[in-house]
Amino acid sequence: YVISTVYMENDVLGFGQIKDRYQLALDLFDVRLMIEPEIVTWACRKATKEQIAKLRELCNEVEMLYKQGHNHIQKDIEFHSYLAKLSGNMVVERLIPVINTSVVIFANITYRSLMQETLETHRAIVNSIEHKDPVGAKCAMNMHLTYNRQVIMELLEKKKKVRKNHEPDDI
């Protein structure tokens, strides 16, 4: 299961040149933790009923694809991109390529290891926005990103151990 790198086409920040994909994914998640919880608080304030219905539809599509074993990445990117759009902030909308890069890199590294957590936190984000609950939306997004970040941290730790075990002794 290989995910296309077509999302790197707007690579104005040069992420495609970075060799350490694990560290890049971690750093991108750190940036997402700085930005996305605020995005959903703004979405709570600004989203219309029609927009919330579309967000729920995207959430359901991600879930259906994920559960059926299909590639859900494009829909997941649409979900997060739509959240950014709902914030009503044109700068945030232009930050979408950074967010999309993170989703693709993370999916390549972890391949479906957080399905249940992803589905539950996506639903919690949508429900919180629907109920105009910015604190709930922010908490759900923090949980979503923290689960993902933790997996990256564990993978980085394993990678470091493998490297250490393959280094010659300094005797």
Feature annotation, model-predicted:
Residues 1-34, 41, 162, 169-171:
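Short linear motifs at protein or domain termini
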Residues 8-22, 52-54, 73-78, 149-153, ...:
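Short, charge-rich amphipathic segments
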Residues 28-108, 117-126, 136-150:
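Conserved amphipathic alpha-helical segments that form helical-bundle/coiled-coil interaction surfaces
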Residues 111:
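A glycine-/small-polar-enriched, mobile loop at the entrance of the PLP active site in fold-type I
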Residues 114:
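Short beta-strand-centered segments that line the small-molecule binding cleft or hinge
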Residues 129-132:
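Conserved short acidic donor-positioning loop in nucleotide-sugar-dependent glycosyltransferases
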Residues 135-171:
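C-terminal effector-binding regulatory domain of bacterial HTH transcription factors
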